[in-house]
């Protein structure tokens, strides 16, 4: 198996021209696409419909290209859209493809290479979102994805991206009508509960937390429990979790590798450099032009520190009634990463409940080997 990854700019939420160009020119085959991971220019909140709009645009395109229904497209390709391109972040999508190749002649000296596997959970009932059923279903799915990708060791997993559902007024009403409660009656807060439950599922699958320490009560409450490689993004456009596991495996060929580090806070540039160093792209204090030329994309989570401080300095992101704190945080983290890699077209998703330490989050880099 061999993974390929392509980063493509988007001029608007329905712009599939960059991907179409790659396919028309024979750079990639539509049949080999397994995931489209996008940053869309909406507000990243409950009523951000750019995520669904972009997903629909890609489903229509691939449906026509592959000659199958949109439903079938959705069953074979994970469309994970994260809304919010605040600050200098450039809207774009990252395309993951998997080619079936024979790596039997590969030597041990060639090392591990990027392995990717997409997988889907079942659809969740509204009363399950942000609670233990979502945790355990996500954990089971991540374990299956690791097996299918040939990733034997949890330490070889460097980034797990999840698109998860949220609660709307209608979904809450449905649960109540059937005699159930929901994790929260605030639609925006439900995004955090869903992200948090999904992240804890990843942590459980990778052995970062013990199941005995998990319950409905700890979700969005006990931030000492987290995954250092989880990246979860909630949206209105689905009711299941769509997951892509990224790691390194000797069973895969190609010239791509992935590494990660843990940002302690929103301005932790040292962690960004460490993630670059993890894939051989920052030998010295700062990456060189040649090293940056091998970087395919950077992926990170962003969050306004819940204690209201960054390095003992007060911040006001949580007190802004006009702009949600996740929007502030995305702009900050994107700027930090862009200042190091020299490119604002990187993937930064807001809301990092149980995704890295409180106020921080994981940062991962996919790059070509030297």
UniProtKB/Swiss-Prot annotation:
Q: Which GO terms describe its molecular function?
A: cyanuric acid amidohydrolase activity; metal ion binding
On whether Hydrolase is a keyword of this UniProt record, the answer is: yes
On whether Hydrolase is a keyword of this UniProt record, the answer is yes
Q: Which UniProt keywords apply?
A: Hydrolase, Magnesium, Metal-binding, Plasmid
Q: Which InterPro entries match?
A: AtzD/Barbiturase, AtzD/Barbiturase_RUA, AtzD/Barbiturase_RUB, AtzD/Barbiturase_RUC
Q: Where does substrate bind?
A: 51, 82-83, 195, 233-234, 330, 349-350
Catalyses: cyanurate + H2O = 1-carboxybiuret + H(+)
Residue sites binding Mg(2+) per the record: 303, 352, 355-357, 360
Q: Which residue intervals make up region (RU A)? A: 1-103
Site Important for substrate specificity: give positions: 326
E.C. number? 3.5.2.15
Modulation of this protein's activity: Inhibited by barbituric acid.
Q: Which residues participate directly in catalysis?
A: 163, 233
Q: Where is this region: RU C?
A: 256-370
Gene Ontology terms: biological process: atrazine catabolic process
Region (RU B), start-end ranges: 113-250
Pathway(s)? Xenobiotic degradation; atrazine degradation; biuret from cyanurate: step 1/1
What does the entry note on its domains?
The monomer structure is formed from three repeating units (RUs) that share the same structure as one another. The monomer, the active site and substrate all possess threefold rotational symmetry, to the extent that the active site possesses three potential Ser-Lys catalytic dyads. It is possible that any or all of the three active-site serines may act as nucleophile (albeit only one can do so per catalytic cycle).
Record text on subunit structure and interactions: Homotetramer.
User: What family does the Swiss-Prot or TrEMBL record give for this protein?
Assistant: Belongs to the cyclic amide hydrolase (CyAH) family.
State the protein's purpose.
Responsible for the hydrolysis of cyanuric acid, an intermediate formed during catabolism of s-triazine based compounds in herbicides such as atrazine and polymers such as melamine. Catalyzes the hydrolytic opening of the s-triazine ring of cyanuric acid (2,4,6-trihydroxy-s-triazine) to yield carbon dioxide and carboxybiuret, which spontaneously decarboxylates to biuret.
The name this protein goes by in its record: Cyanuric acid amidohydrolase
UniProt source species: Enterobacter cloacae
As recorded in Swiss-Prot or TrEMBL, the protein's gene is named: trzD
